Amino acid sequence: MPASPTATAAEIKDVNTRYHDAAADSYDAKWGIDYGEVGQAQVRGKLVKALGHEPEVFGVALEIGSGTGYFSLNLVQLGLIERATATDISPGMLATLGRSASELGLEVETVCTEAETLPFADDSFDLVFGHAILHHIPDLGRAFSEFERVLRPGGTVAF
C-alpha cells in the first residue's frame, strides 16, 4: 500500500527532504532531544520494547532515517553499538548529526540515501534499525527487502 493515495514516491521524498532540511538546525531543541542520561534511558527503553528483551551489544549497525541522530548517538554512548552508520534523505539532518557526534566525541558515518536503495554490500550489518521512520518511506516492501539484503545472517531488524 502506498504512503499516499495521490502523491508519487518522488513527491513524498521531496517534501520530506525539504521539510527536514529546513527544520534540521532547530530540530533537537524543538523536540527536546537529549544525548545525556535521560536520552540514553529513553532510547534503551524503546530498543528493549522493540526487541522484547534486553539488547545485546551489536557490532556494526545501520540506522534508517536517522534524522539528527537521537538513536544512533545514544546507542553508541551506551556501548550497545560498536560502529554506527546513519542514513537519511535529508543532508541537513545528517549535518546536524555530524556536529552533535563531534561535540560528543563520537564517530558515526553518515550517508545520504533512500531506504529503498541502500548503497551497501550484502551482509554488512549486525543491526538494521530505525525510529519514527516507517511512515516516511513510500515503498516499505522494497525498503524491507533492502534491510534484509544488507543484514548479516543472524542479524537483527528493529523498528
Task: Identify the role of each PLM range.
Residues 141-156:
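A short glycine-rich, Lys/Arg-flanked "PGG" loop and its adjoining helix->strand segment in the class I
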